[in-house]
Amino acid sequence: MRIGIDARFFGPVGKGLGRYVERLVENLEKLDSQNEYIIFLRKENWDYYTPKVSNFKKVLADYPWYSLKEQIMMPIVIGREKLDLVHFPHFNIPIFCPKKFVATIHDLILLQFPTPRATTLGPLFYKIKYFGYRIVIGLGLRRAKKIITVSECTKKELVKFFKINPEKVEVTYEACDGVEYGQLKMPEKKHLAKFGITKPYLLYVGNAYPHKNLEGFLKIFSKLNLDCQLVLVGREDYFYKRMKEDIRGKTLERDVIFTDFVSEAILADLYRNARLYIFPSFVEGFGLPGLEAMSYGLPLAASDSSCLPEIYGDAAIYFDPRNEEEMIEKIKFVWTDELTRQNLIKLGLERVKRYSWENLAVKTLQIYQNVGKN
């Protein structure tokens, strides 16, 4: 078969989605020497990927995500490459794709948590974007030969929202990068001073979109009455800037640290030195940073909503993200109770072993082969 992968999100430019595409391609290169693969990239990530084997080739498809140009030009490029199958790793599926395709849907956050606060667009344009999203994803999912989700929770939501046959949907769990499980390096504190970290700290890694509930967490942070700091790791964008403005001049400002984007080495040190990882989201598709925290031996306090209990199992303490008192109680408990902390660390290091990028690639390849036969 000649298989195309829309890898325009490949690498750091695509954040979590970029990592998914990157790890999928890396592992398919190791697993499959029979099929030919065409990896579609944009100029901004063109140099980030170099095929390591002869049956993989990269092709430029420099069309912006979620654009009209993408809808028009991607079908032309796909047709030109004479593909048997295409994998779209996100919901921005060209609705006139001329070939059989599978699609990965990581979450349905725009449907589950619609809010104009999640965009810099005005209310009217947000509504247009919302309805455009529903049309594109609805048409794409109906035409897809198979749909991949990264959790059973997202699969159930997909079936419910779009009335899709559950047999059409396969789950392939993601995995975390990082340290060798059970072989944790000693933490280094050389990077902490540069950010003004002077106390034990709670850690969060990711964006600050409204569904992440960071604004809600900031409301209860000072009520924890713990002599600690809150370290928020994520590229400074409109949403993080808005949070900074919201706390400017308030007492908690001195104990909330925004690191902006950091390198992998610095991020590893921030994980290793933290006392607790917090994940207060209202809704998620997988919750990868929580697994990363576990892999570094960091206890986790997480929301009990959406997919998080499915992914973390008994290796986390859970709270209702809409209940301030419960959030405070659970976070203080895992912060102070050493027996619980050590148990969570042990369970977390075991939990991450369930998830593997190789397993994801194996199952994805099986999906390609099954679709190709039919």
Name each model-derived stretch:
Residues M1-N374:
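Carbohydrate transferase catalytic cores enriched for Leloir-type hexosyltransferases
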